[in-house]
Amino acid sequence: DNGRSRGLGDVYKRQAENRESFANLLKDLNLLQPKNGLANSQLEALEISRQLGFPLLIRPSYVLGGRAMMVAETEEELQHFFEEALRVSPEHPVLLDEFVKDAVEVDVDLLADGENSELGGILEHIESAGVHSGDSACVFPPHSLSEKTLLELERQAKLLAKNLKVRGLMNIQFAVRDSEIFIIEANPRASRTVPFVSKSIG
């Protein structure tokens, strides 16, 4: 009604979509996230890069499909990619994330009622982390993750959904490197993987 999301209250929607609020929530829940920063200018971006190091994942705010998302290996690439990201979303800061090397990217889709949730599936990307999910093939069930890792992914996904008071579908993207699990982002809505998961599990 009136274009409002039925699955998530405004406060929790802002918490999921606002980078600073989301980072604070993950910290409170003892969940890992790649180190990151927000930059409104090239100078700020360079300062952040010197804190985080390279490579860095550069992406504009509030865009879909991985548009203008690039991995910068040098300050020169950072400056070029930053301008492109700012051009795509000029009203919002550019997101800079530590690039998690040698990681497996994972999508988790779940359905929640505000308190409890059920996982639809855990999908493992075939490409290495850093290729946007819209451009990446994935497999279900995951083929290289241990049972311990799968249980931990489920725990973290349900914990996050509960604390965001999600009512409806939610997609969470993870990067798994050895025994470390990083949360890349959480989207309290249906993702492109939902039809695939739905058909796979019947």
Report each predicted region and the residues it spans.
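Single conserved hydrophobic/aromatic residue that forms the stacking wall/gate
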Residues: 1-12
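Generic structural marker for isolated residues within well-ordered, non-membrane alpha-helices
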Residues: 1, 23, 45, 157, ...
